[in-house]
Amino acid sequence: MTDPTPQTAELVRAGGDHIPGLLKRVEAQLKEEAGSWGQPLGPHGGQTISAGGKRLRPLLLLLVAGEPSGDAQAERLVRAAAAIELIHSATLVHDDVLDNADLRRGRPTVFSTAGPEMATYTGDLLFARAFTLVTQDGDLFSVRELSEACSALARGELLQREDAWNTAVTVDRYLERCRLKTAALFEAACAIGADGGGLDPEPMRDFGSRIGLAFQLLDDVLDVSGPPERTGKPRGTDLLDGTVTLPLILAAERDPSIAATDLRALQDSEAAAGLCDRIAATDALEQSRARALEMVAEAKGLLPEGLDEERRDSLELVADGVVARYS
């Protein structure tokens, strides 16, 4: 199993004695996937999966589901959790191709080591294998949820490309893009976990949506404010790529000179950092954080009243952990 971050380790402990074992099974399932592909894609799939990460989406699915009633239910949850992570990994591989990214989580990307074609094929296979996992048990609910999430991911990516370089993007348009591109997979994780754990999927889907949106908003704040030694990338990387985020949108509403900025004219990290300083000089970062905190509070309020204490505590920790990651 990949080493958890301190925040993730706390969530694992809070989720109950069954969570570490289930996560180990998810990790074993991912390792089995990576080892089953053969040449030439196998090593690249393994490279992607072994890069680790927080495994937040699989963990969220398992926490929502609660302790399984038997091995058949546990196996279904493990497969679905692994599928969620495979889809998330696929999106990262494809993002690296679109962004010409050489590093991901401090490691070389498939794009940088094998080129854009091999990276594209690797991402495609990750997507395909995710659906193979959830169809093995005839899990049509998970198939439907993951299909909807993948459709949303694609639409969100298209919106991001359409909005590139445009500082006149509205807050509503930005939030819709985030809902599609980021929150949709959180929604699917929570809905699948709820279905497997005997809960109504709809309020849990809404819980996941708020958590995913807060996660993305705070990530965008960190792109402007975060030191490179913490984020692993220079400040303003999104701005250099032409990605218009909430801090920029709010700053443009407050400072006409920012609204008039031509993002295409940002030639290097130093210029992007200068724009970050101008954004930070407004209250845009504080307002972005405040919106994220509102979403976290809304997420907690969506947890069902009859939810058992263990699940409630662990899911509230997830919500708080999204904020703590950026404090």
Task: Locate each region found by the language model.
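Amphipathic, well-ordered alpha-helical segments in soluble domains
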Residues: 26, 86-89, 126, 181-184, ...
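Conserved N-terminal diphosphate/IPP-binding helix and adjacent helical/loop segment
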Residues: 1-89, 93, 97-112, 160-168, ...
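All-alpha helical catalytic cores of prenyl diphosphate-utilizing isoprenoid enzymes
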Residues: 2, 31, 35, 50-54, ...
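Alpha-helical phosphate/pyrophosphate-handling elements in metalloenzyme active cores
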Residues: 39-83, 171-211, 247-252, 296-327
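Divalent-cation-assisted or electrostatically stabilized phosphate/pyrophosphate-binding catalytic cores
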Residues: 104-126, 167-182, 206, 228-254, ...
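A glycine-biased, small/acidic residue-tolerant capping/turn segment at secondary-structure junctions
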Residues: 41, 223-231, 258-264, 313
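Alpha-helical transmembrane segments of multi-pass membrane proteins
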Residues: 91-92, 212-216, 250-253
